[in-house]
Amino acid sequence: MRLISLILLALLSVSAVAAVDMKKPTGKYVQQNNLFPKVKLVTSVGDIIVELDRTKAPLAVNNFLSYVNIKAYDNTVFHRLEPEFVVQGGGYKADMASVDEFPAVFNESGNGAKNQFGSIAMARNNDPHSATSQFFFNLNDNPSLDPGKNWGYTVFGQIQDGFEILEKIKLLETHTDEKTGWQNVPKQPIILKQVILQPEQ
């Protein structure tokens, strides 16, 4: 009986350690001295290498790396595709369960980085400071997403390799999803299999 109790206690301890505190993002500790960390997005359409920019969007980059660090983006879907506009993901698993979210980050859209083709930016709702896990790639130059009189959408990186993957994505058909009722959902699911932090250079 004592042995069983010790085993149960050990299992509970491991579970407690394994649990992620979603109030304490860890991205700022990832390659702390690297201002331009790179990640590889392994998707069902192909691989994309993105260089993140801490000099312009440290909060957004650290936020993104917090999700990468706990593998929150693994086996998620790009749930929104507007072929001449954006492809958006980071919010839902393949079964459409929501990704657990860290606290929202402050909007850094005034950093000078533009929503141009191949850039990655934080998705949000009408509240300019509501960005959490979701992000999008610009499939075109989208100056309407840059700040003007109102807050824009924070660009925090740029594709370095894999532009052809965006071109493939732009050709995919979309529909209204029967389960969710959402429009602009890719007919052929675009799966984000894994996001891999690249070795520091």
Located regions from the model:
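Cyclophilin-like peptidyl-prolyl cis-trans isomerases
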Residues: 17-201
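Bacterial N-terminal signal peptides
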Residues: 5-15
